């Protein structure tokens, strides 16, 4: 048998000359999170597949196309984590953190796995730093997460950042938005790519994320989610913006930031620098409920 001397496609070795740089970034992220009152949580690299199906969403590209899923020797369907929120939420419930003083503020720094086309800044194995504030619906918590991310970039000396924020509402007001999107895109369905034609019924908001130039052009005039927010979600978003202004954090509202996973709700944001970004979001309660 020939000696294997090449890493699997979509993975990358971290050599000594780069390891110290990554260690510095990780240490800065950990220290900043601790300064904001967050404590580290570590979860298994694989979970029951159902956890991601329920939390991330059956209709998402992640679940349908990108997960590394297999049956173990006991016949259980197991998935390498494609993101960190679901495992953190499961640990929050299983270990009774939900019964302790709330909110519970945790952070994680994990390897994640998605079967995607490898490209610059996007590999099949990647490292995700995330923070979760469980047990609060306060807009102040959303603003704090944004401030934390901003502080990490400041300490790393990253310049040229642009913060973009949006609100995608709650499941109630988002249902009306989905209807508006379906109506808009249905008129030009034949022009959409094959993938987006499939998204039209099951998850029309994902069309706004499509990288196809034709779909992007069609989406330019699509309804904005902020026009469909209920009163509660509108007030929540207004307060997030007020808190950011009070902390002198510059931002722009971008109604095209939608994020595609089912547990996203209300505030979503991205720090954009060149071709890379740092996304964030609020998780809705259903994603945190116990399995039946």
Name the predicted role of every residue range:
Residues 1-292:
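TRNA-recognition modules of translation machinery and tRNA-sensing kinases, especially anticodon-binding
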